[in-house]
Amino acid sequence: MSRYTGPSWRLSRRLGVSLSGTGKELARRPYAPGDHGNDRRGKLSEYGTQLREKQKLRFMYGMTERQFSNLFVRAGKIKEGTHGTNFMVLLERRLDNMVYRLGLATTRRQARQLVNHGHITVDGKRVDIPSYEVKVGQVIAVREKSKNLDVIKGAVEAVVARPAYVEFDADKLEGKLTRLPQREDMNADIDEALIVEFYNK
């Protein structure tokens, strides 16, 4: 299954969650798109509820189904912790997500483009793979020739707060993952237990 590239605001309203992280999609119309979106939400089946939760998280991180399910399998092989929490930690450690969490981009989609276009380095080496798994202590930075990009400067200026598990140097435009995130650090709107149930059927 390919990555969704349509309008994120429409998908956000359909799933009932802000995929961009800004909340703007749901501010004016907190219901599904379409002529009858305001009264179209009926009771979902157990499978439908699990599927919607899975889709919410997958689209939030901008991944294909294959990428998403493969990472889920990897999370299941980690011996410590719960499957669901380990899965969410692996999602958070993706390079595109870390670029977003550091505030170098306003959305994960924008962060993925920065990585794809070679604007980001890890420990001084250019990395253009969005799914690259960031380790604790690795330094994520903007390449010297990319530091004057308006999209990056605008994103940094717009940051209100950053997660407790990262630190950032605005002068150097670099930061790092200081520790692995705990469940309470991550999205409270996601019920990962439903996703575990979906894949374990």
Curated annotation (Swiss-Prot):
- One GO term describing the cellular component: small ribosomal subunit
Q: What is this protein called?
A: Small ribosomal subunit protein uS4
Physiological role: One of the primary rRNA binding proteins, it binds directly to 16S rRNA where it nucleates assembly of the body of the 30S subunit. With S5 and S12 plays an important role in translational accuracy.
List, in alphabetical order, the Gene Ontology terms for molecular function in this entry. Answer: rRNA binding; structural constituent of ribosome
Q: Which Gene3D superfamilies match?
A: Ribosomal Protein S4 Delta 41, Chain A, domain 1, RNA-binding S4 domain
- Protein's organism: Limosilactobacillus fermentum (strain NBRC 3956 / LMG 18251)
Protein's GO biological process: ribosomal small subunit biogenesis; translation
Q: Region Disordered: list its residue ranges.
A: 22-47
S4 RNA-binding domain segment(s): 93-153
